């Protein structure tokens, strides 16, 4: 993470390191203006300069000769440094910096050839430390140079980088690959060199004389030099840990074999000199200000120790052979089962000799079949000519062809012709840590003890501080992408380590309980034989023993059991997949898997509080809609990546669905967030400057994310993709070559079973390439090798392959031919469905909502549809206006005619009290054979929105043949208002203040009803030609970006009812029910109420009628006061009309007679008025004269509006209009119209008083 000069800049400020030694003496100091290639020294000059500088540092002082096996040898007495030792070391350091701009690394190669580190730097460091101030300064300079020379270096990667940059000197560039071997030699010399007195080694000197004195200094007393020294020493440890051990074989040299376990030797040396304890202290104190500066380098050291090693090799170390120490935490069963065999590969685990023999036999057979095995040539050769089944002449050139049938030879020839050159598959992603060699038993035990302490005290503080620095983008971390990947890999390793140690402790505890129960049985038997007093004492002692505390509680990793950890892996997975940063992708998926396993273990805890925490974590994580989408993206992500990538995909496909299925199975209903489609302008964060800011904030607050019901069967069906099936087949091919474990094969078989059996999508494995390999596995010896290495999972794999091949054999020949061609049968296209309807967003007036709908239709060039609605409203308004005027004519005629007998008067009264609204009929909009208009009215959301906004009702019994109609409850005056609104927005579109019309509406889905999953599926035969199911922008490009679950009617008509235009809501037409007894009583009640209103309209007119026409009725008028109380009781008991009618009493009969007489008198009064008025009957009014309709409609509306108090209260504001309309009618019939106006005015005032 850090660079080479981060700590050396602090060291250069020390006066002890400054010297008057001049670099110009050798002429290798870079000056300004002398950076040309001609001035650059060659490797010979650098080698000579390095040798001279080494001579200036010092040398061993040889003493007297001593006898060794009869020969005389000089004896090393002591190290003697020269006067210019410090200057020479500093000059070597500057000479080393020349490699910063040299791609061929001449200085590094010259130092390695001169063995500067072995013969000069290490002796000076070992013999000068602790020898006063000058000796400590020399030791500090040597450590500085030692750190620079051991800096991590990847020769192959450097070579590729230089080739990309265009350096053509490949002869010199190829030399830098040898620097990796030099680093291994440096590590070996550093670990094995000791001082002359054999009391000091390099790590001990650095720790004792450099690191500890400066690390023990208090924070406020620590100088810049001390900080640099601490950083330098830690970087030296990091460099040594980063140097990997060489890969050895049986043919490797002795030197290479001796260096095969350098990492284990380094761990033991660091443990001996308490360097591991220092790293543990820095980790546990990483959040403190005193030690936070070195959290990055400490995490790097821990990363290079553990990452790249299988967790089981540290958490559950098992060693074979006698004399090796076993782990004190490993169970006897585990150790006995894992000591059956060993292998040179540390990560493959123990493999039996039978498995190795079968693998070798399979390899030999494969080589023999391909003709690559060495054979003994006969004197006549091995070329065979044969004619294949297709009639072509072919040639076979191996001896095995002598005993093979022609069909098999032809098949092999065809396979060889189709064989393509495949590039070598990588085992790891580029930049991933290399796999470490096998740890020695002592080193593994040391690492286990240290890892236990680290998880308990240092893991969480270190991870928390490093993640905080990554968010703050600290410079000490270097490349942030690399730091982020490493901390995720470190977290995944130690979380998995925690799980394994917890499982091991639980097994050991259960075994102890089992053994304890057996011992307690014998103890109880012995206790029964003792005296009663002794029994009481023993039982008391056993009761006082406390319960054993949990060894690995979840509190140790509580930081990772928080929502931020899941959000982090989710975000990093999505971003790394978009940028194709596969190393980070693998690290985040691996951490995700371990977190899921950790939550699963937490959910199975015995403590209820821990189970509640796991429940909350899963509920919050699964509820996020991005989680399930990211899971499906992971399942489809494999193409040609490495085996590590493939292993992560298969492991995730094994763990994630398993946990999700278990979580969903415990719930009747599970809801997750639906995908939210945000408009582009809102994604960019733009706000409309012309629009009111408060209104925009209100709209943003009203936007909520919708929910949808989650079904695991749908999730599992989407999991079965061709990408995941391909990943399974490729993983199956590469599992044996990469020394996979049985657990990995078990995960693979489970994933394949989920695809083929549970998701019922076995056709994903029917492709020719997949099927051929499955048949090759089951027919050859490959499955036998699998069974030897995985005796539990391989039989299940065999059964699954048999099942898939049997399913393919049952296909028709036509389908088999399609799969043999490498294609899949085309799936039937999904049937078209009813497009989702839309509504206008809240916050707009009713007129503006109509303007939005008109604008959307005009934008889609649907002007004929708008005019179709407008003309229908005009026709319905004209027809209803005519009915109102005809009613007025009939009323005028009845007022002129004389009064008849009582029975005739009663019939005329009922006809007279009939409301014009009752004569209205629903007006159905006709399509006139226009199929396009019929389809748009049934399927287009914009057109249906306009229909609902103007109050139309729909009969949606047929999906593609909706019948729209104008309800009979809408009065002509309100129809005219809708017509005027449509005309206004056709002339002048709605001003949206710069916003798109599509941003003002939102889609709305009807709630799902059980058993109606296919209720909105359209029949393609009913659709016109050219209709592709995308009739609306809402289904094309997601302009209506907000979907909500419908919990109310599609269009709320509360604003229409508030205007008094509708007597009920306008919405989807309800199903007609059969008339009941309650409906008849309600109608009868309405008629009686109309009669009573007319009777009680005017007491003055009633008195006039009694005085002028029927004097004998005056005696009956005296009973009026006695019937007032009874009339009030009748008005208060209107709610009893739906119940059974009680028997009439004498008082009720008297009231009926009085009302009948009053009605007769009122009819006689009207007859007299008609006789006195000899005016002409007013002509039928034109539909354009709409002002004359107001008074009549108000009066008629008043007669039917008792059930809606809100509508009645709205009439007081409309009274002046009624009076003005009445004044226009006095010209034709002043007395008639004056009387009617007076009656209506009194009726309105009476109703207001009652309210």
Swiss-Prot record:
Recite the UniProt keywords alphabetically.
Cell cycle, DNA damage, DNA repair, DNA replication inhibitor, Meiosis, Nucleus
Location within or outside the cell: Nucleus
User: In what ranges is there compositional bias, type Low complexity?
Assistant: 330-348
Q: Which GO terms describe its biological process?
A: DNA repair; DNA replication checkpoint signaling; meiotic cell cycle; replication fork arrest
Kindly state one GO CC term assigned in the UniProt record.
Answer: replication fork protection complex
Q: What functional role does this protein have?
A: Involved in chromosome segregation during meiosis and DNA damage repair.
Q: What is this protein called?
A: Topoisomerase 1-associated factor 1
Q: Source organism lineage?
A: Eukaryota, Fungi, Dikarya, Basidiomycota, Ustilaginomycotina
């Amino acid at each position: 993470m850090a660079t080479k000069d981060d700590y050396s800049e602090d060291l250069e400020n020390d006066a002890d390191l400054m010297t008057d030694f001049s670099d110009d003496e050798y002429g290798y100091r870079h000056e300004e203006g002398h950076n040309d290639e001609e001035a650059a020294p060659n490797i010979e000059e650098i080698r000579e300069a390095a040798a001279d500088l080494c001579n200036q540092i010092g040398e061993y002082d040889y003493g007297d000769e001593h006898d060794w096996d009869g020969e005389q040898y000089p004896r090393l007495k002591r190290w003697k440094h020269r006067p210019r030792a410090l200057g020479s070391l500093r000059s070597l350091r500057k000479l080393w910096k020349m490699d910063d701009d040299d791609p061929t690394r001449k200085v590094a190669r010259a130092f390695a050839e001169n063995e500067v580190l072995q013969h000069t730097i290490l002796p000076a460091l070992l013999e000068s430390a602790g020898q006063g101030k000058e000796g400590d300064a020399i030791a500090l300079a040597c450590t500085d140079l030692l750190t620079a020379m051991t800096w991590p270096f990847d020769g192959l990667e450097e070579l590729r980088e230089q080739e990309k940059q265009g350096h053509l000197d490949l002869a010199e560039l190829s030399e830098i690959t040898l620097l990796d071997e030099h680093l291994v030699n440096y590590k070996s010399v550093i670990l094995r060199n000791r001082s002359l007195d054999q009391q000091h080694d390099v790590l001990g000197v650095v720790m004792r004389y450099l690191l500890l004195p400066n690390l023990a200094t208090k924070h406020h007393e620590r100088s810049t030099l001390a900080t640099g020294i601490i950083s330098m020493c830690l970087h030296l440890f990091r460099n040594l840990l980063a140097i990997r051990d060489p890969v050895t074989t049986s043919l490797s040299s002795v030197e290479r074999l001796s260096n095969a376990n350098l990492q284990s030797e380094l761990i033991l040396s660091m443990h001996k000199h308490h360097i591991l304890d220092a790293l543990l202290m820095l980790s546990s104190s990483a959040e403190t200000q005193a030690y936070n500066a070195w959290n990055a380098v400490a995490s790097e050291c821990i990363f290079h120790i553990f990452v790249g090693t299988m967790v089981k090799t540290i958490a559950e170390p098992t060693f074979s052979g006698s004399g090796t120490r076993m782990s004190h935490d490993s169970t006897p069963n585990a150790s006995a089962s894992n000591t059956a065999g060993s292998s040179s590969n540390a990560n493959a685990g123990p493999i039996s000799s039978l498995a190795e023999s079968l693998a070798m036999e399979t390899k030999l057979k494969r080589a023999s079949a391909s003709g690559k095995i060495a054979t003994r040539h006969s004197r006549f050769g091995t070329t065979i000519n044969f004619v294949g089944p297709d009639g072509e002449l072919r040639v076979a050139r191996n001896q095995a062809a002598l005993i093979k049938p022609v069909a098999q030879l032809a098949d092999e020839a065809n396979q060889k012709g189709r064989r393509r050159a495949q590039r070598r598959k990588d085992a790891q992603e580029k930049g991933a840590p290399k796999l470490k060699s096998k740890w020695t038993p002592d080193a593994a035990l040391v690492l286990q003890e240290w890892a236990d302490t680290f998880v308990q005290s240092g893991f969480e503080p270190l991870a928390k501080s490093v993640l905080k620095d990554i968010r703050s983008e600290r410079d000490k971390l270097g490349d942030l992408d690399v730091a982020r990947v490493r901390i995720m890999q470190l977290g995944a390793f130690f979380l998995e380590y925690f799980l394994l140690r917890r499982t091991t402790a639980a097994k050991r505890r259960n075994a102890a309980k089992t053994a304890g129960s057996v011992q307690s049985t014998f103890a109880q038997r012995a206790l029964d034989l003792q005296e009663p007093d002794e029994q009481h004492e023993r039982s008391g002692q056993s009761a006082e023993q406390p319960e054993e505390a949990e060894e690995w509680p979840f509190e140790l990793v509580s930081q990772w059991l928080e929502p931020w950890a899941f959000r982090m892996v989710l975000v990093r997975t999505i971003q790394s997949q978009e940028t194709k940063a596969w190393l980070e992708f693998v690290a985040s998926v691996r951490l995700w898997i371990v977190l899921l396993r950790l939550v699963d273990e937490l959910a199975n805890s015995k403590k209820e509080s821990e189970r509640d925490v796991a429940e909350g974590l899963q509920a919050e994580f699964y509820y996020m809609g991005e989680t399930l989408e990211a899971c499906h993206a992971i399942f489809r992500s494999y193409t040609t990546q490495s085996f590590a990538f493939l292993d992560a995909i298969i492991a995730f496909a094994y763990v994630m669905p398993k946990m999700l299925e278990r979580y969903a199975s415990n719930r009747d209903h599970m809801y997750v967030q639906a995908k939210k489609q945000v408009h582009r302008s809102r994604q960019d964060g733009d706000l409309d400057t012309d629009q009111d800011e408060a209104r925009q904030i209100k709209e943003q607050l009203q936007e909520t994310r919708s929910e949808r019901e989650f079904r695991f069967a749908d999730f599992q069906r989407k999991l079965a993709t061709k990408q995941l099936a391909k990943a399974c087949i490729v993983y199956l091919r590469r599992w044996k070559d990469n020394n996979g474990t049985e657990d990995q094969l078990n995960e693979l078989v489970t994933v394949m079973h989920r695809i083929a059996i549970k998701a019922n999508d076995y056709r994903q494995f029917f492709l020719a390439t997949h099927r051929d390999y499955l048949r090759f596995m089951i027919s050859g010896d490959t499955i036998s090798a699998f069974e030897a290495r995985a005796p539990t999972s391989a039989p299940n794999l065999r059964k699954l392959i048999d099942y898939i091949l049997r399913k393919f054999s049952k296909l028709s020949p036509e389908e088999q031919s399609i799969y043999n061609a490498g294609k899949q049968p085309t799936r039937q296209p999904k049937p078209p469905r009813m497009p989702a309807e839309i509504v206008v967003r809240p916050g707009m007036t009713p007129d503006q909502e109509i303007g939005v709908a008109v604008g959307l239709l005009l934008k889609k060039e649907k002007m004929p549809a708008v005019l179709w609605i407008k003309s229908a409203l005009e026709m319905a308004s004209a027809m209803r206006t005519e009915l109102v005027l005809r009613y007025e004519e009939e009323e005028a005629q009845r007022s002129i005619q004389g009064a008849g007998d009582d029975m005739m008067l009663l019939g005329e009264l009922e006809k007279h009290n009939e409301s014009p609204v009752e004569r209205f009929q629903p007006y159905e909009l006709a399509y006139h054979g226009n199929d396009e208009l019929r389809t748009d009215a049934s399927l287009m959301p914009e057109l249906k929105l306009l229909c609902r906004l103007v109050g139309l009702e729909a009969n949606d019994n047929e999906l593609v043949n909706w019948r729209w109609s104008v309800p009979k409850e809408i009065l002509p005056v309100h129809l005219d208002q809708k017509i005027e609104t449509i005309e206004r927005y056709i002339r002048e579109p709605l001003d949206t203040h710069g916003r798109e019309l599509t941003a003002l509406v939102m889609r709305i889905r009807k709630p799902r009803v059980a058993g109606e999953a296919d209720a909105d599926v359209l029949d393609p035969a009913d659709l016109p030609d050219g209709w592709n199911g995308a009739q609306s922008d809402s289904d094309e490009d997601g302009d209506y970006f907000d979907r909500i679950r419908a919990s109310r009617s599609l269009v709320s008509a509360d604003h229409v009812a508030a205007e008094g235009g509708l007597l009920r809501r306008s919405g989807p037409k309800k199903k007609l029910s059969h008339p009941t007894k309650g409906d008849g009583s309600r109608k009868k009640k309405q008629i009686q109420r109309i009669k009573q209103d007319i009777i009680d309209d005017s007491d003055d007119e009633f008195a006039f009628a009694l005085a002028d026409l029927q004097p004998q009725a005056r005696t009956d008028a005296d009973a009026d006061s006695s019937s007032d109380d009874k009339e009030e009781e009748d008005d208060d008991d209107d709610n009893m009309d739906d119940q059974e009618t009680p028997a009439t009493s004498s008082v009720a009969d008297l009231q009926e007679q009085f009302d009948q007489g009053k009605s007769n008198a009122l009819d006689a009064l009207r007859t007299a008025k008609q006789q006195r008025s000899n005016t002409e009957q007013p002509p039928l009014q034109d539909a354009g004269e709409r002002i004359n309709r107001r008074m009549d409609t108000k009066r008629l509306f008043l007669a039917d509006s008792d059930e809606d108090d809100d509508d009645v209260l709205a009439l007081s504001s409309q009274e002046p209009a009624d009076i003005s309309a009445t004044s226009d009618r006095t010209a034709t019939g002043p007395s008639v119209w004056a009387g009617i106006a007076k009656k209506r005015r009194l009726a309105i005032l009476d109703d207001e008083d009652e309210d």
